[in-house]
Amino acid sequence: MKKVYLLSLMILSGCLLTAQPQQLISKIAFGSCASEAERQPVLDLVVKHKPDIFVYLGDNIYGDTKDMKALQAKYDSLAAKPEFQRLKKNVKLLATWDDHDYGWNDSGKWYTFKKESKELFLKFFEEPLNSDRRKHDGIYTSYMFEGNGRKLQLVLLDNRTFRSDLRLYRGELSRNEKYFYPLDYYPHEIEDSTMLGDTQWKWLEEELKKPADVRIIGSGSQFGISFNGYEAWANFPHEQKRMLALIKKTKASGVLFITGDVHYAEISKLETKGQYPIYDVTASGITSTWLFATPNDNRIEGPVMENHFGMLTIDWSKKDPGLKMEIWDVKDNQRIEHTISLSEISFMNSK
């Protein structure tokens, strides 16, 4: 009886849900940009496709407030949706945030209520009470899935809590016809700004040192695109270079990004000398849409402008596992399929 009681206490306190390796998975669904005020039929399609996990990549609600009661009410609205309840019942949910659920459009480290917002986020996604996420600033975290001699690492970054102010656009590219729309931001030219902050960077280095065959890095902001004047890692080119240098330094093969934010889907391929290509699969539009896709020199698939979700499927049965990247739209049409072999994103094949 004492053992049963102790086990119950451990479950309630989250002790059984610490960052221990979990069973190997092969199907990862993901998406972002979901207004709690709208129907979300995409979520029922996610359930239909039977992924092992679903990763929320930010703008999971549209908070945009400094009133924590209002932010909680928006989480309550999402929780009450039948389609969200079906998703939660059938698929394991993991999440990071972006600006709107963090609290304010395009906000970074100066958002006043980031600690209070964090508590609401962790409560909504049922973070274990003893989770490391509750012990440090921000919500960055990682998971390891393993079995049959293979390992998959999922890293979820926090690109809000520590991010420096963006540099405002002041007409520097006004004569460039490539940018046919109003730009908001321009890349930082000095390296005194940050996306992740020193503590998160140090943590990430230790994570990338861990053995893994596939490493999926989730970021609310797009990583692999070229500059487009909107929010992205490209506004912090020194931080983008730091990420690539860190991947190379730690010899972390198998890295692939999943991102959100922009209200359309695409796949970007970022190629640099002496390093394998970094793929970035953007799935952004559970409910949100945009009028156009911005220029992206690194785009190899897309864009898909209709509501959608993303899927990564790993074929572990092969000696050289296949990685299939997909985008499925709200009518359950496969709009993008792009498959690579794991060896293609390995330092063994870098040039």
Predicted regions and their residues:
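Long, structured stretches of catalytic cores involved in phosphate-ester chemistry, encompassing
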Residues: 21-351
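Bacterial Sec-dependent N-terminal signal peptides
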Residues: 1-23
